[in-house]
């Protein structure tokens, strides 16, 4: 895995009241790398630059914690998850959640299954 500066990402998460472990940060970085890799062969997202993915996909997904109490064991379904936002990002940040990712396209489901296996 390449080296990434995660300082801003961690700061943005802390501003939401979320402190990520080293393992969670590693999972987000792996997710980012796989997103960019798979996006080269299938259109998962228009946002592929590191800083933008961290802010516009990951932090924005985690920000759901401000509107919805995710500290308790909850069941969440992400309908039309696409590349896994917000569902998979929420699952990484809040492992206590039971998250179901739902999408109509098999290529996206295949991508998500690969990411989940890698994490």
Region annotations inferred by a language model:
Residues 62-119:
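Conserved SAM/SAH cofactor-binding pocket of Class I
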Residues 1-4, 8-73, 77, 114-119:
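Class I SAM-dependent transferase core
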């Amino acid at each position: 895995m390449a080296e990434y500066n995660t300082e801003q990402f961690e700061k943005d998460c802390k501003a939401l009241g979320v402190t990520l472990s080293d393992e969670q940060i590693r999972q987000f970085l792996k997710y980012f790398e796989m997103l960019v890799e798979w996006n080269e062969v299938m259109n998962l997202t228009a946002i592929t630059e590191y800083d933008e993915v961290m802010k516009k996909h990951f932090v924005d997904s985690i920000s759901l914690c401000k509107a919805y109490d995710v500290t308790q064991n909850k069941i969440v379904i992400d309908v039309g998850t696409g590349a896994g936002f917000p569902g998979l990002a929420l699952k990484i940040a809040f492992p206590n959640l039971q998250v179901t990712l739902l999408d109509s396209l098999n290529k996206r489901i295949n991508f998500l299954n690969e990411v989940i296996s890698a994490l």
